[in-house]
């Protein structure tokens, strides 16, 4: 049985994109908190969401299904979108196994996902 300890952090980029950092194991018990955060900002017309999964170890199938259904709602009702960034390990294998690429787009990095929404992160190099 999977330990359903989870952490969720978020930030808003340029008043148009929410980046949700899902950490540890995301199980059905974590869905109310995820929904609360997303709906708070949807009411403020922030309807583009990036799920950053760099520190996520596991996502329960019901959560994947929720994100797929919610993406359809965003596309149809709010002209928004959900994308993924920084997947690795078991989360990446599940994404591939469940053929979720047909439903939710994935980006290798957060910068790539932000660029998808027209946000350019300028990185300075020495």
Model-identified regions with their sequence ranges:
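A cross-taxonomic marker for long C-terminal extensions/tails that follow the last structured domain
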Residues: 114-126
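Short, solvent-exposed coil/turn elements at secondary-structure transition points
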Residues: 25, 88, 110-112
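Amphipathic alpha-helical interaction surfaces in cytosolic regulatory modules
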Residues: 28-104
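Short acidic-hydrophobic, aromatic-tinged amphipathic segments that line or gate anion-handling sites
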Residues: 103-113
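STAS-typified acidic loop motif
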Residues: 2-39, 53-55
């Amino acid at each position: 049985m999977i330990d359903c300890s989870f952490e969720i952090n978020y930030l808003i980029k340029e008043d148009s994109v929410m980046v949700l950092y899902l950490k540890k194991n995301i199980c059905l018990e974590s869905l109310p908190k995820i929904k609360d955060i997303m709906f708070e900002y949807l009411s403020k017309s922030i309807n583009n969401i990036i799920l950053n999964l760099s520190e996520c170890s596991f996502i329960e199938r019901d959560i994947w299904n929720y994100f797929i259904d919610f993406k359809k709602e965003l596309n149809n009702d709010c002209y928004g979108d959900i994308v993924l960034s920084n997947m690795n390990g078991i989360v990446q294998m599940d994404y591939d196994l469940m053929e979720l690429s047909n439903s939710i787009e994935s980006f290798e990095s957060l910068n790539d996902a932000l660029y998808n929404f027209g946000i350019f992160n300028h990185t300075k190099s020495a």
